[in-house]
């Protein structure tokens, strides 16, 4: 449906603001409704629709705060990956196999394999517990497959991971 549009809004990074979250339009952007909001400190960084089922939507919410001279806070208790199976009406936080906020969970970048929607990859910023993770059950559970921080070490800045459009076993990170 080309009239259905989703937007991830991080909000400004210098303090709390109510504009953060995931928004949806069902009329091509004429009107918007906020469909996922955690709090005024947690913004949405990414929203992705399953390429094979438009009712399944994932969103990365990140509680990050920029301070003066780069002394911000880059993780917060509400950071995480969220999944909706009903077009964005309800959301569930995906936690199985992912680092916790107590372990330093920050920003997540993720992708869905176009050839197999059950296969997902994510770069997870979480200090020693971070890395590149893989899910084989559409985000319900995750396994860390790479710990070398050269592949994911600036996840709070970039958090990019992509899967090859023809081969779900090939993944790229930046």
Residue ranges and their predicted role:
Residues 1-174:
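Beta-propeller blade termini and top-face loops
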């Amino acid at each position: 449906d080309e009239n259905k549009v989703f937007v991830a809004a991080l909000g400004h990074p210098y303090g709390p603001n109510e504009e953060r979250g995931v928004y949806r339009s069902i009329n091509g952007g004429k009107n918007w409704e906020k469909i996922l909001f955690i709090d005024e400190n947690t913004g949405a960084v990414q929203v992705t629709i399953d390429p094979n089922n438009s009712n399944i939507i994932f969103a990365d919410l990140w509680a990050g705060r920029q301070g003066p001279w780069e002394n911000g806070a880059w993780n917060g208790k509400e950071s995480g990956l969220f999944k909706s199976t009903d077009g964005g009406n309800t959301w569930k936080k995906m936690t199985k196999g992912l680092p916790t906020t107590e372990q330093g969970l920050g920003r997540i970048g993720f992708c869905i394999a176009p050839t197999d929607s059950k296969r997902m990859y994510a770069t997870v910023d979480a200090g020693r517990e971070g890395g590149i993770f893989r899910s084989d059950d559409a985000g319900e559970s995750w396994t860390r497959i790479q710990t070398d921080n050269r592949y994911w070490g600036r996840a709070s800045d970039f958090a990019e991971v992509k899967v090859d459009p023809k081969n779900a076993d090939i993944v790229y990170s930046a």
